[in-house]
């Protein structure tokens, strides 16, 4: 069939054009194309080894979603495996081969001093010493204490010697154990971080084990307590050897050591109760021992409340060396610790009774000694301790009023430590004169530093940035600055550039008033009077009394390194306990700083305030 296209082309229907149209249509049909591809793939699979299809199989790898050149595929897989093996090998080398880490920063001066301060307690141990005691010039001593006394006739071996002599005074010894325990309860993580936790706990147990021997600790009710072992009074004349009449190493003592008991001694009993109660919290994970301490503490506090009186009657050895001025502060102090150890509200009621606070001197704000924390006056420590209770538990009625009073009084005490208020004088070198210029000032200085540092940590833990002194607000850093300034003075930042901790720094006292340190450990026994030649010599002590805090400078920052003048050079157990507590509170380590908020409350039940009494009936 023919025709003419109006545009000049033929109108003939061509079969060739029809075929081309079919091809175009097939190109648009992808399903048909895929069917052809499937047939091709089947031919590859069915082809023999000599066929061209077999050659293609060797050259390509079909992954389903794509077809890859076999060489490229194998190279890629090999590379990935090689890189993986190399990385694994490197990681294994890094883990297995020891590599050097940057050394930790050197400990600060407070940590260094703390290690030494604890060693002083090792040097003061009485009785059979452990092999790891670490003081080469000390040995077993006074192994018959109590057994040779015709009245007591029981073992009083152990405990700590008080100072440069060999007397064991329970009153300052118990306070020292309370202070060490308090510092562990608040700063356990710090002790652990510097490797001293086991050491300080061992020292506390050494003290509390001895205190448990000094009364009938297995009874619920007692009628007497041992107050001290040994005698120091030489004022009565005569040639009766005792711990002050003689100058001997404790290991060589052969003179009688009398035991002094008391039958009405509320101050001593309550302080010993505080020591055992605080230690029971330290050892709460050792339930048997902790329970033993609590039982003893209950008996002691009960005895103190029932048998009223001071442990240091006029003219006694106790009154000469560690006179107690009152027992009311011990009732508050001991009651607070008994409450924390037992959770029994009866003890808290005693500690917070308004009459108790009044008798303890809580309202004697004009007293020159208000706020001076010592082995004799525990009120400032009790106020801080009970302020802690209010800050973190807020027990409410009926305790809130007196707790708020204690809290406000603690704020006032902290204000009194600041130089701008002139509550206490300061030496030109910067030492606060809490004992008003009298001798042996450092024991009071370190106690104040501890309370200030601890209270600042309490405020921080309670998210309280500071406190008010009248209309003026001060941050907690002001308290820490005060505490650091006092410890820095003790450690050498003073006009004499003298460290008052033996063995710390380049310049420290070489002639501590101490029998054991001053007499050579050379196998020679020097008798009662034979040792005095070592007391009088101007040579340095042959044995270094590591960590001992000496009595300190005078009010003009002057110091005499003279063995015979105990007002400058004698260390004491109580002073070193305050030093340890202050140092650990300011130690700067790379662990969680601040206090342990909760451990002290581990025995305290949840607080459900007692509702106030109903109002009286209305009458028209």
From Swiss-Prot:
Topology with respect to the bilayer: Single-pass type II membrane protein
Subcellular location: Membrane
Record keywords: Carbohydrate metabolism, Cell wall biogenesis/degradation, Cellulose degradation, Glycoprotein, Glycosidase, Hydrolase, Membrane, Polysaccharide degradation, Signal-anchor, Transmembrane, Transmembrane helix
Origin superkingdom: Eukaryota
SUPFAM superfamilies: Six-hairpin glycosidases (SSF48208)
Glycan attachment sites: 216, 314, 323, 344, 408, 425, 567
Catalytic residue positions: 165, 513, 561, 570
TM annotation in the entry: 72-92
Cellular component terms (Gene Ontology): membrane
InterPro entries: 6-hairpin_glycosidase_sf, 6hp_glycosidase-like_sf, Glyco_hydro_9, Glyco_hydro_9_Asp/Glu_AS, Glyco_hydro_9_His_AS
Substrates-to-products reaction catalysed: Endohydrolysis of (1->4)-beta-D-glucosidic linkages in cellulose, lichenin and cereal beta-D-glucans
UniProt EC number: 3.2.1.4
GO molecular-function terms, A-Z: cellulase activity
Known tissue expression: Ubiquitous.
Single GO biological process annotation from the record: cellulose catabolic process
Family: Belongs to the glycosyl hydrolase 9 (cellulase E) family.
Protein name (database record): Endoglucanase 10
Gene source species: Oryza sativa subsp. japonica
């Amino acid at each position: 069939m023919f025709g003419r296209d109006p545009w000049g082309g033929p109108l003939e229907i061509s079969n060739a054009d029809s075929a081309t149209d079919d091809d175009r249509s097939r190109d648009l049909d992808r399903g048909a194309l895929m069917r052809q591809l499937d047939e091709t793939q089947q031919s590859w699979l069915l082809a023999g080894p000599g066929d061209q299809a077999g050659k293609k199989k060797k050259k390509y790898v079909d992954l389903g979603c794509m077809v890859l050149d076999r060489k490229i595929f194998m190279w890629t897989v090999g590379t990935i495996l090689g890189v993986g093996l190399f990385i694994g090998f490197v990681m294994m080398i890094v883990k297995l081969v020891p590599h050097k880490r940057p050394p930790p920063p050197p400990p600060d001066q407070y940590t260094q001093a703390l290690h030494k301060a604890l060693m002083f307690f090792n040097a003061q141990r009485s009785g059979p010493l452990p092999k790891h005691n670490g003081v080469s010039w000390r040995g077993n001593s006074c192994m018959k204490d109590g057994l040779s006394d015709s009245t007591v006739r029981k073992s009083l071996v152990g405990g700590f010697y008080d100072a440069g002599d060999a007397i064991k005074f329970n009153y300052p010894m118990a306070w020292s154990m309370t202070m060490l325990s308090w510092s562990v309860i608040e700063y356990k993580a710090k002790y652990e971080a510097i490797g001293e936790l086991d050491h300080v706990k061992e020292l506390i147990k050494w003290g509390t084990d001895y205190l448990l021997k000094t009364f009938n600790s297995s009874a619920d009710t007692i009628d007497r307590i041992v107050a001290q072992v040994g005698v120091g009074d030489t004022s009565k004349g005569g040639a009766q050897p005792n711990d002050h009449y003689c100058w001997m190493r404790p290991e060589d003592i052969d003179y009688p050591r009398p035991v002094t008991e008391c039958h009405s001694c509320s101050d001593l009993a309550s302080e010993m109760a505080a020591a055992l109660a605080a230690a029971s919290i330290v050892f709460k994970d050792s339930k048997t021992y902790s329970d033993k301490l609590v039982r003893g503490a209950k008996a002691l506090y009960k005895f103190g409340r029932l048998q009223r009186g001071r442990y240091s009657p006029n003219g006694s050895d106790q009154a000469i060396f560690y006179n107690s001025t009152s027992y009311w502060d011990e009732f508050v102090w001991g009651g607070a610790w008994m409450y924390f150890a037992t959770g029994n509200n009866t003890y808290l009621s005693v500690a917070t009774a308004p009459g108790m606070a009044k008798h303890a001197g809580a309202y004697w704000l004009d007293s020159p000694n208000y706020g001076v924390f010592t082995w004799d006056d525990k009120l400032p420590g009790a106020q801080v301790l009970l302020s802690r209770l209010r800050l973190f538990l807020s027990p409410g009625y009926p305790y809130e009023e007196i707790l708020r009073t204690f809290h406000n009084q603690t704020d006032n005490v902290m204000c009194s430590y600041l130089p701008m208020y002139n509550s206490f004088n300061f030496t030109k070198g910067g030492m606060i004169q809490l004992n008003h210029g009298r001798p042996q000032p450092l024991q009071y200085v370190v106690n104040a530093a501890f309370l200030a540092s601890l209270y600042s940590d309490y405020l921080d833990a309670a998210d309280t940035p500071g406190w008010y002194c009248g209309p003026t607000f001060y941050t907690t850093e002001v308290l820490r600055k005060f505490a650091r300034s006092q410890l820095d003075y003790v450690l050498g930042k003073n006009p004499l550039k003298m460290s008052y901790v033996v063995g710390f720094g380049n310049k420290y006292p070489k002639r501590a008033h101490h029998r054991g340190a001053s007499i050579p450990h050379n196998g020679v026994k020097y008798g009662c009077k034979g040792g005095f030649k070592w007391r009088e010599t101007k040579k340095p002590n042959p044995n270094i009394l590591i960590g001992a805090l000496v009595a300190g400078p005078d009010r003009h920052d002057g110091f005499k390194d003279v063995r015979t003048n105990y007002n400058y050079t004698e260390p004491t157990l109580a002073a070193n306990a305050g030093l340890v507590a202050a140092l650990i509170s300011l130690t700067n380590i790379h662990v969680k700083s601040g206090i342990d908020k909760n451990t002290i409350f581990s025995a305290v039940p949840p607080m459900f305030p007692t509702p106030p009494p109903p109002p009286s009936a209305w009458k028209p």
